C-alpha cells in the first residue's frame, strides 16, 4: 500500500505543470518506494518472529529438560514408595512363612524324637530276634554239616566200588576189541589181494582189445577221407568255372544298391526330421496361443476379483475404523469406572492385609502350620458334638457364604468391561466348563498346584471363617453353661447357708429348711438337689463334647482353647 505523507508546498503547481507521462513515472516511483518500505517492514517482522521462535524453542527445550528431570524425580519417589510397600508386604509374608516353618520344624523335631525312640526300640528287638535266629542257624548248620559228612562218606565208598568195577570191565572190553580188530585186519588184507589180482587181469585184457579195434577203425576212416577230399575238389573247380562272371556282376550291383539305399535313407531321415520339426512348431504355436489366451482371461478375471475385493476391503476397513473408534470411546468411558473400582478394591485388599497381619499375632501354633482348617479332618471318629450348636453354625455359614459369593461376583462384574459382560451374561456360563470365559485369572491349589474352579476361590477363606464362627459359638455355649452352673451353685450355696444359719429371712421363708414336717421336707429337698446335680452333669458332658468336636485335636495344638469342666458335689447335712 502507498502511504500518504505530508504535502509539499508547491507540489500542486508542479503536478499541474507535469505531463501524463511524468505523472505516470512519478506514481510508479512512489509505488516502488512504498513496496520497498513494506517489504523491508515484512522482512524485519519475519526476522523478529524467527528470533522469537528460536528463543521460544530454546526456552521450550530447557523447560522440557527441567520438566523431565522433575518428572523423573517424582516417578523415582513413587517407585521407591511402591517398592517399599512391596518390600513390606514381602517381609510380612516372609515372617509369616518363617513362623510357619518354625512351627513345622518343632513338630517335625517332636516327630523325629518319637521316631528315633521307636527306631531304637525296634533295633533292640530286631537285634534280639537276629541273635536268636543266628543261634538257631548255627545249630542247624552243625546238624547239616554232620549229615553232609555222613552222606559224603557213603558216596565216596560207593564211588570207589563202582570205579573198580568199571575199570575191570573196561580192561576186559578193550582186550576183546583188540582181538576182534586184529582178526578183521587179516581178513580185509586177504580179500584186498584177491580183488587186486582180478582187477589187473581184466585191465590188461580190455586194453589189448581196445588197441586192436582202434587200429582197424583208423585205417577205414583214412580211406574214406581221401575219397571225399577228391570229390570235393572236383565239384569246387566245376562251380568256380560256371559262376565266376555272374559273381562279378552281382558284386558290382550290390555295391551300387548299397550306395543308393544309403542315399535314400539319408533323404528319408532328413524329410522325417523336417516333418517332425514342422509338426512340433505347429503344436507349440497352438499350445502357446491357447495358454496365453487362458492367461489373459485369468488375468482379466483376477483383475475384476481384485477390484471387487478392494472395494469390499475398503468398506470393511471404514466400518472397522468406525467400530474401533466407537470401542475406543466406550473403553475411555469405562476405564475411569474400572479405575475407581480397582482403587476401591485395592483399599479393601490393603485393609484385609492389615487385618490379617493383626490377626496373625493371635494365631495358634496349629493354625500357623495348618492355616486352612478342614472340618472333616478336625472332627475325630466316635465323637459327637452338640447338635444344636452344629446346626446353628451350619445355618449361619450357609447364610453368609452365598452373600459373600454374590458380593465377590458383583465386584468382579463391575471391574469387567461391557464387552466381557455381554459375552458372559451369567455366572452359569462362567462356570459351565473349561471353554467358557471367566471373570478373573486362574487360581491354583497351594498343595497340588492344580487349577481351582471359580466357585471354589473363597473355599479357604470360608474354612477359616467357619472355624472362627464355630469357636465363637462353642465359647458362647460354654459361657451360657457356666453362667447357668454359677447360678445353680449360688442357689445351692444359698440353700446351704439358709440351712445352717438362723435369721429373719430364713424364718420368714415359706420353704424353711430348718422346719421338718414328718421328716418329709428334708427328703424332698435331697431328691430335688440330686436331680438338679444330675441335670447339670449331663449338660456339662454335652457342652464338653461340642467343644471337643469344634476345636479338634485337643492337646495336640499348644494354643487350642481348653474347655473347663466344673463339678461341684454338694452335700446337705
From Swiss-Prot:
Localization terms from the record: Cytoplasm, Cytoskeleton, Flagellum basal body; Cell projection, Cilium, Flagellum; Cytoplasm, Cytoskeleton, Flagellum axoneme
Record field: compositional bias (Basic and acidic residues): 13-22
Regions annotated as coiled coil: 15-231, 258-359, 470-501
PTM section of the record: Asymmetrically dimethylated at Arg-96 and Arg-142 during flagellum resorption. Probably methylated by PRMT1.
A biological-process GO annotation: axonemal dynein complex assembly
Record-linked InterPro entries: DRC1/2_N (IPR039505), DRC1/DRC2 (IPR039750), DRC1_C (IPR029440)
Ranges of compositional bias, category Basic residues: 1-12
PANTHER family reported for this sequence: DYNEIN REGULATORY COMPLEX SUBUNIT 2, NYD-SP28 PROTEIN
Family: Belongs to the DRC2 family.
Binding partners and assembly: Component of the nexin-dynein regulatory complex (N-DRC). Interacts with DRC4 and DRC5.
Function noted in UniProt: Component of the nexin-dynein regulatory complex (N-DRC), a key regulator of ciliary/flagellar motility which maintains the alignment and integrity of the distal axoneme and regulates microtubule sliding in motile axonemes. Plays a critical role in the assembly of N-DRC and also stabilizes the assembly of multiple inner dynein arms and radial spokes. Coassembles with DRC1 to form a central scaffold needed for assembly of the N-DRC and its attachment to the outer doublet microtubules.
Protein known as: Dynein regulatory complex subunit 2
Gene: DRC2
Amino acid at each position: 500500500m502507498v502511504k500518504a505523507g505530508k504535502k509539499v508546498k508547491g507540489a500542486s503547481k508542479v503536478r499541474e505543470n507535469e505531463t501524463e507521462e511524468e505523472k505516470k513515472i512519478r506514481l510508479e516511483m512512489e509505488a516502488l518506494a512504498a513496496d520497498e518500505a513494506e517489504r523491508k517492514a515484512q522482512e524485519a517482522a519475519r526476522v523478529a518472529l524467527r528470533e522469537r521462535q528460536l528463543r521460544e524453542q530454546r526456552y521450550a527445550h530447557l523447560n522440557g529438560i527441567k520438566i523431565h528431570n522433575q518428572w523423573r524425580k517424582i516417578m523415582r519417589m513413587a517407585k521407591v514408595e511402591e517398592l517399599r510397600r512391596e518390600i513390606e508386604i514381602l517381609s510380612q509374608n516372609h515372617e509369616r512363612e518363617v513362623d510357619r516353618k518354625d512351627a513345622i520344624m518343632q513338630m517335625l523335631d517332636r516327630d523325629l524324637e518319637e521316631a528315633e525312640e521307636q527306631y531304637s526300640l525296634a533295633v533292640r528287638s530286631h537285634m534280639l530276634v537276629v541273635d536268636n535266629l543266628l543261634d538257631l542257624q548255627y545249630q542247624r548248620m552243625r546238624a547239616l554239616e554232620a549229615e553232609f559228612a555222613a552222606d559224603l562218606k557213603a558216596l565216596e565208598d560207593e564211588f570207589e566200588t563202582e570205579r573198580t568195577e568199571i575199570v575191570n570191565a573196561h580192561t576186559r572190553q578193550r582186550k576183546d576189541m583188540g582181538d576182534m580188530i586184529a582178526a578183521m585186519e587179516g581178513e580185509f588184507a586177504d580179500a584186498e589181494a584177491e580183488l587186486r589180482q582180478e582187477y589187473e587181469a581184466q585191465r590188461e585184457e580190455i586194453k589189448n582189445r581196445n588197441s586192436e579195434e582202434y587200429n582197424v577203425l583208423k585205417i577205414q576212416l583214412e580211406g574214406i577221407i581221401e575219397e571225399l577230399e577228391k570229390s570235393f575238389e572236383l565239384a569246387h573247380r566245376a562251380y568256380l568255372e560256371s559262376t565266376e562272371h555272374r559273381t562279378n556282376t552281382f558284386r558290382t550291383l550290390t555295391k551300387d544298391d548299397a550306395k543308393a539305399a544309403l542315399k535314400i535313407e539319408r533323404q528319408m531321415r532328413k524329410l522325417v526330421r523336417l516333418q517332425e520339426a514342422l509338426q512340433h512348431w505347429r503344436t507349440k504355436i497352438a499350445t502357446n496361443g491357447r495358454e496365453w489366451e487362458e492367461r489373459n482371461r485369468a488375468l482379466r478375471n483376477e483383475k475384476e476379483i481384485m477390484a471387487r475385493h478392494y472395494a469390499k476391503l475398503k468398506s470393511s476397513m471404514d466400518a472397522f475404523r468406525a467400530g474401533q473408534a466407537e470401542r475406543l470411546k466406550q473403553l475411555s468411558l469405562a476405564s475411569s469406572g474400572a479405575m475407581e473400582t480397582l482403587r476401591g478394591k485395592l483399599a479393601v485388599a490393603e485393609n484385609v492385609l492389615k487385618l490379617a497381619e493383626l490377626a496373625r499375632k493371635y494365631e495358634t501354633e496349629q493354625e500357623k502350620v495348618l492355616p486352612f482348617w478342614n472340618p472333616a479332618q478336625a472332627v475325630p471318629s466316635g465323637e459327637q458334638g452338640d447338635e444344636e450348636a452344629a446346626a446353628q453354625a451350619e445355618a449361619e455359614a450357609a447364610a453368609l457364604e452365598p452373600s459373600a459369593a454374590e458380593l465377590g461376583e458383583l465386584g468382579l462384574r463391575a471391574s469387567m468391561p461391557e464387552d466381557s459382560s455381554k459375552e458372559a451374561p451369567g455366572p452359569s456360563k462362567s462356570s459351565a466348563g473349561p471353554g467358557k470365559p471367566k471373570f478373573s485369572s486362574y487360581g491354583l491349589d497351594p498343595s497340588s498346584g492344580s487349577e481351582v474352579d471359580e466357585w471354589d476361590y473363597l473355599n479357604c477363606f470360608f474354612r477359616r471363617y467357619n472355624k472362627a464362627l464355630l469357636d465363637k459359638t462353642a465359647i458362647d455355649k460354654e459361657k451360657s453353661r457356666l453362667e447357668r452352673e454359677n447360678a445353680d451353685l449360688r442357689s445351692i450355696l444359698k440353700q446351704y447357708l439358709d440351712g445352717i444359719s438362723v435369721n429373719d429371712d430364713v424364718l420368714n421363708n415359706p420353704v424353711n429348711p430348718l422346719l421338718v414336717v414328718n421328716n418329709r421336707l428334708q427328703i424332698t429337698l435331697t431328691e430335688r438337689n440330686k436331680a438338679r446335680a444330675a441335670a447339670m452333669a449331663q449338660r456339662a458332658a454335652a457342652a464338653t463334647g461340642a467343644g471337643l468336636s469344634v476345636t479338634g485335636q485337643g492337646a495336640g495344638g499348644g494354643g487350642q482353647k481348653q474347655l473347663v469342666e466344673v463339678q461341684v458335689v454338694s452335700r446337705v447335712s
